[in-house]
């Protein structure tokens, strides 16, 4: 995938393209290169703050790197400026999940899914908030919903498997 990005950057002079930077950050995040994805997200923030704010990868890298204050600021900035976007409530839910206020996180993930029922990252966050409270049935339902929304994506299936392992349900 990096070769394709390199060709686009060199041949078409798209090195500063916010769309390309966002795509690279997402690819790095999916390859578990969280720090590199975060660095690109910060570059995206400088170039295109609107696209940065709409990017689940921007939110997820802050979550995964335990950047509580940055995530708090971004989440509340999004909620204030874009209350009709699922990313806003997803970010707020991620913040509350990060500080282990799981029931509060659930309510914000639920709000994100009510704003856009097809926003799969919120369903995964919703499942994680349920799993953190040992509510396995609800967690599995949320992960299955995410799996239906993203057929072929491994992430919801990974969370389903992790939930089976967590509950020692090996059937």
Language-model features, listed with the residues they occupy:
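Conserved structural position within tetratricopeptide repeats
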Residues: 10, 43-46, 77-80, 111-114, ...
């Amino acid at each position: 995938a990096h070769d394709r990005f390199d060709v686009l950057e060199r041949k078409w002079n798209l090195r500063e393209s916010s769309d390309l930077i966002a795509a690279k950050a997402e690819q790095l995040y999916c390859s578990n290169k969280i720090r590199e994805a975060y660095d690109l997200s910060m570059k995206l923030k400088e170039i295109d703050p609107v696209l940065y704010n709409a990017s689940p990868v921007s939110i997820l890298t802050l979550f995964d790197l335990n950047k509580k204050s940055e995530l708090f600021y971004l989440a509340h900035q999004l909620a204030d400026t874009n209350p009709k976007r699922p990313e806003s409530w997803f970010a707020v839910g991620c913040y509350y999940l990060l500080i282990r206020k799981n029931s509060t996180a659930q309510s914000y993930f639920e709000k994100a899914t009510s704003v856009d029922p097809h926003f799969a990252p919120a369903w995964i966050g919703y499942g994680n908030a349920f799993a953190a409270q040992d509510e396995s049935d609800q967690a599995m339902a949320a992960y299955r919903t995410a799996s239906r929304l993203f057929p072929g994506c491994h992430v919801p299936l990974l969370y389903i498997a992790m939930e089976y392992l967590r509950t020692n349900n090996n059937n």
